[in-house]
Amino acid sequence: MARVTVEDAVDAIGNRFDLILVAARRARQIAVGGKRPLVDPENDKPTVIALREIELGLVDSSSMDVIDREEQQHQEAAELAAVAAIVGGNQ
């Protein structure tokens, strides 16, 4: 298991409070959201993987916002397509 120094991750994000928010958000994406890790998992838990990604500069607050926006747009497009299919099927 790789050791992650939180200090390096804090330096990458700016402060420890934002680090907690970004790391928790990314760990949730990996654990529950089915997102692939950007680094080799090496049998690490999602929280450690998230911290390693942050430490390497692969993930930050703004990149998380972009990912969330893209996912929301994709979900909305899928919902609109489903509604269009239902409406089109009823005519």
Curated annotation (Swiss-Prot):
InterPro entries named among the record's database cross-references: DNA-dir_RNA_pol_omega, Pol_omega/Rpo6/RPB6, RPB6/omega-like_sf
Gene Ontology molecular-function annotations: DNA binding; DNA-directed RNA polymerase activity
EC number: 2.7.7.6
Annotated catalysed reactions: RNA(n) + a ribonucleoside 5'-triphosphate = RNA(n+1) + diphosphate
Uppermost EC category: transferase
GO CC terms in record: DNA-directed RNA polymerase complex
GO biological process, one term: DNA-templated transcription
Keywords from the named record: DNA-directed RNA polymerase, Nucleotidyltransferase, Transcription, Transferase
Pfam families attached to this UniProt entry: RNA_pol_Rpb6 (PF01192)
Subunit: The RNAP catalytic core consists of 2 alpha, 1 beta, 1 beta' and 1 omega subunit. When a sigma factor is associated with the core the holoenzyme is formed, which can initiate transcription.
Family note: Belongs to the RNA polymerase subunit omega family.
NCBIfam families (UniProt xref): rpoZ
Role according to the record: Promotes RNA polymerase assembly. Latches the N- and C-terminal regions of the beta' subunit thereby facilitating its interaction with the beta and alpha subunits.
PANTHER family noted in UniProt: DNA-DIRECTED RNA POLYMERASE SUBUNIT OMEGA
Record's protein name: DNA-directed RNA polymerase subunit omega
Species for this entry: Pseudoalteromonas translucida (strain TAC 125)
